[in-house]
A protein has these predicted regions:
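Peripheral, non-transmembrane regulatory/ligand-interaction domains of membrane transport proteins
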Residues: 1-112
Length: 112
């Protein structure tokens, strides 16, 4: 699932993929392969960058390729048994978009 958000003078608008425009934030959570391919095609963001945070064992790092930057960090995540664990959060900075990718909904991104 994903949400596309755009800041406007009246607040924050949620857009459809067909309405994607420069300056949007795409927040991706537990996406299907089809959704990832749609977003990659619409944004020209590398599929490898979009899928990096979907591997629970992925290590934190910064990677650059062309005009895109991938920042991968581990964030705290509360498991159902009340134990904390970590999950990768991918932050992709592209020329026209910012994208966040995570396996689970999380408080880090929800605060925005």
């Amino acid at each position: 699932m994903y949400k596309i958000l755009k800041s406007t003078p009246n607040g924050i608008d949620e857009l459809e993929l067909e309405q994607l425009e420069k300056g949007c934030w795409i927040d991706i959570v537990s996406p299907s392969p089809e959704e990832l391919h749609e977003i990659a095609a619409a944004t020209k963001i590398q599929l490898d960058f979009l899928t990096a945070a979907l591997d629970e064992e992925e290590k934190s790092r910064i990677e650059t390729e062309d005009d895109q930057i991938l920042i991968l960090v581990d964030i705290p995540f509360l498991r159902s048994n009340k134990d904390y664990d970590t999950l990768p959060l991918g932050i992709i900075i592209a020329e026209d978009f910012i994208v966040t990718v995570c396996l689970e909904p999380n408080a880090v991104v929800a605060d925005f």
